[in-house]
Amino acid sequence: MATASGAGRVSEPPSTAFAATGLRPLAIGPADRPADPARGEHALLVAGIGDMVITDDPAAGLVAYGLGSCVALAAWDPATMTAGLAHFMLPSGTSGGGPVKFVDRGLPAFLAAFEARGGSIRRACFKVAGGAAMLAIHASSLGIGRRNAEAVTAAMAARGLTFVATDLGGTVGRTVQLDASDGRLHIRSVGRASVI
């Protein structure tokens, strides 16, 4: 069963929003019933800003739309087919927001939820994307994207965890989709598509 953690919701983007990403489309079931794999339909779980989604359904896709300075951390355990995606907004903080709004508090929560769902962080393949400098002012003074990328990298290293692939920095936003069947992270930005 594919579920989103945190609020316990499963969300599907409007079909036009998904089509605009250019990612490999997944067939989504109508809103009035669950996706039916027999019909070629699969769950699409959306990690909004400050949110995470975790599933043990290998037919699911996990997506984070419009990463600018935000960073998405993908985790996939090939033994249990557990997949997770966290959408971090800031390196640290204490104000409200979703369960993974801040890297410093959100990364431990994400890793704990991933393991609670059946994944092993020692066996998992981790990938990270985002952390762009969207505006010249951000690149020169605030550096939120760079700081987000550094915070995730440092927090993972402090736990002895490494990335098998990264797509960080730059000056354009990204949309990412984690394929729960094989751990591939599809990345789409203006004028570019890649898989890591």
Please give the residue ranges for each predicted region.
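Active-site microenvironment for binding and transforming phosphate-containing groups
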Residues: 1-196
